[in-house]
Amino acid sequence: RSIHQGWFDGTRPDLDLYDSPLKWLLSNCKLFRRDLVETHKLRFPEDMRIGSDQPFTIEALVRAKRISVLADYTCYYAVTREDGGNITQGEVEIYTRLECAERLFPFIAGLLEPGPRRDAILHRHTMWELTKPLRENLLELDEDGRKDVCARVASIVDRYVTDDVMALLPIWRRVRLRMAQRGDLERLYEAIRADAAKTAYPITLKKGRVYLRYVGFEDPAAGLPDDLFEITKGLRRRLKEQVRTVEAKRVGNDVEVTVRTPLTGPDADDPATVGLALAPRGVKGRTPVEGTTLTPDPGGQGVTLTARIPLAPLIASGRGKHTLRLIVRTSAEDYDVAVPAGMTAVKGIMWHRAMPYLLTVHGDARGTTAILTHRIGPRTVAGRVRRATSKLRGGGN
């Protein structure tokens, strides 16, 4: 089974259930003291079709005086399935998952008083058991079935899922749960279909904060607060997935680059918030690209940045390579993201102080937009001229 190996690569005599990955590892593949099992009469609820090991394991971990990791010797051997999975992975009927959640939430609430410790455990079950019924297979049910599932999920949210737990979830999970809780089924179905189609959502910058324009965002009829859509982590990943240099061209002794972004909102076209910079090879600092033009997309899908970069300063810096960076400033953090290349490469010869240089704008080995300026000798220039002349003559014939 795939587990957090970092916590189990050495002996840990006293592991905290609430501040460790243990709450995500609730199978019964552990060693339990007999007196713990018998004192608290720990048993598997055999009527649960899936997840029957969880009540046993959770109560054992909650009631244990100490939880230890023993890595000094092999305690026992576990034989995995051929696919490395377990009964709760893969295709499980939606009502089976829902019934599992309906058993686990009140069980945990009976073990732990409301507060951070209960929330730490229920975070795990809200993340997995409670949101899985709100995936694509929900749409395979008839309307009565869909309403029944959503009403039962909503009942669990109402009783057990605090705002603190909700804030820990990925945006799509917490928004779907709130939609189910509000009975907003049409928007819930829309969100499920959009995610199934791998929709790339714009990112809104507003008052120093960052939001995902997921289904229901800034929709008065949906009645969902903005903070439900706030991106608190993972912005760099989202930007790297959606930002691209879509065009690069030589303009005299400059290079003009066009970068498409998913950024929208009142702050997205503010140069104080969004801009471009160059990262010289071998230097930690960034050189801002001055005079960048920010143009909002008419359809509200993003902002396009266009900048003309003088080549002479790049050559004079003595650094043969500069990579393009997108800078996004928010109230919480400044984001510095390498801009992936999605354009046709540019190559040519330019002169600086009577010396020839080879200019290349392309995607480097990591796929990042890079501007390369390398000094070349007269023979190389002559060879390029001969090849170009030969091609022209060949085209003329």
Stretches with model-predicted labels:
Residues 1-110, 132-138:
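Donor-binding/catalytic cores of nucleotide-activated saccharide
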Residues 43, 120-129, 185-190:
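A broadly tuned preference for mixed-charge, low-complexity surface segments
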Residues 136-397:
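Basic, ligand-binding patches in group-transfer machinery
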